[in-house]
Amino acid sequence: MHAFPHGTTATPTAIAVPPSLRLPVIEAAFPRQLHPYWPKLQETTRTWLLEKRLMPADKVEEYADGLCYTDLMAGYYLGAPDEVLQAIADYSAWFFVWDDRHDRDIVHGRAGAWRRLRGLLHTALDSPGDHLHHEDTLVAGFADSVRRLYAFLPATWNARFARHFHTVIEAYDREFHNRTRGIVPGVEEYLELRRLTFAHWIWTDLLEPSSGCELPDAVRKHPAYRRAALLSQEFAAWYNDLCSLPKEIAGDEVHNLGISLITHHSLTLEEAIGEVRRRVEECITEFLAVERDALRFADELADGTVRGKELSGAVRANVGNMRNWFSSVYWFHHESGRYMVDSWDDRSTPPYVNNEAAGEK
């Protein structure tokens, strides 16, 4: 079992995966790859987090590399131009910081602070250039990352990305509502909400600037392409739930597939873990089947025209990266400090976040 170290070379090192979380098929059939830009990516994103003041300097120094945010993206968007991958990695790092702010706002009951942030993010998404110097560094960092993402493809792609992220913001608001009221959503409601809070279609949209081609709706919505994209994201979300379950139970959270199964289907913890794992394994099996259909679709697009060749190449590259997402997500969960709950002083409080409880920031 190999994973990449936190240094500047891509020499694999052994990582022990707990038996309950180990997926031999991922280790055997989904070889891990890493974008060659990764060492520079890690360094530049670390600098960006400091410059944008998204994390305190001492926490960046101590935790940023070990959180492995850049490793996750560098293992996904293979073939992306360096500039595109850098913009995606910075946006992804911002997303994790936003997720942590959202969590702390819930923990400390900062409803007003969350409401203000929610409104500002909606506004900044539509006009990032007007928010680059906002007093809330989270808003300014978001504006910077979105402005850069908007530079790669036509305005129609930007509008779709914005539309998808507006729904993500609203899904985070629904999660805020549920968690502050102790509401555990039913399984189907949770699965629908999880597709939004995990930003399934955002990460799928970002495959397009990575391959340098905006896909027309007829291609993007083709059943094989769309199903492959969904399965890769479902795997990531549900494997995240499997790995996060101890942390989220310790933190009295309510948003986890395992917690919904325990609450609404009367499963024991052991049974819930087994059911989440079963769903994770089904995603892998079904992806391996639909991947063939998606690649066959890519071949069909190559109709002898220049445009057909471009679309065929883009779909093939994107489906290859959907495959990469499985291995990148898998190893991320066993390398990143986000999931090393047993090493924290307080299992309910990540050491890499600002846990300021006073006031509404």
Curated annotation (Swiss-Prot):
Classification via CDD domains: Terpene_cyclase_nonplant_C1 (cd00687)
A Pfam family: Terpene_syn_C_2
Entry annotated with the keyword Metal-binding: yes
SUPFAM superfamilies: Terpenoid synthases
Stored Gene3D superfamilies: Farnesyl Diphosphate Synthase
Annotated binding of Mg(2+) 1, by residue: D99, D103
Cofactor binding notes: Binds 3 Mg(2+) ions per subunit. Can also use Mn(2+) and Fe(3+) but less efficiently, and other divalent cations such as Zn(2+), Fe(2+), Co(2+), Cu(2+) and Ni(2+) are nearly completely inefficient as cofactors.
Motif (DDXXD motif): 99-103
Gene Ontology terms for molecular function: epi-isozizaene synthase activity; metal ion binding; terpene synthase activity
Enzyme Commission numbers on file: 4.2.3.37
Cofactor or coenzyme needed: Mg(2+); Mn(2+); Fe(3+)
Class of enzymatic activity (EC top level): lyase
Family: Belongs to the terpene synthase family.
Protein name: Epi-isozizaene synthase
Top-level taxonomy: Bacteria, Bacillati, Actinomycetota, Actinomycetes, Kitasatosporales
Gene that encodes the chain: cyc1
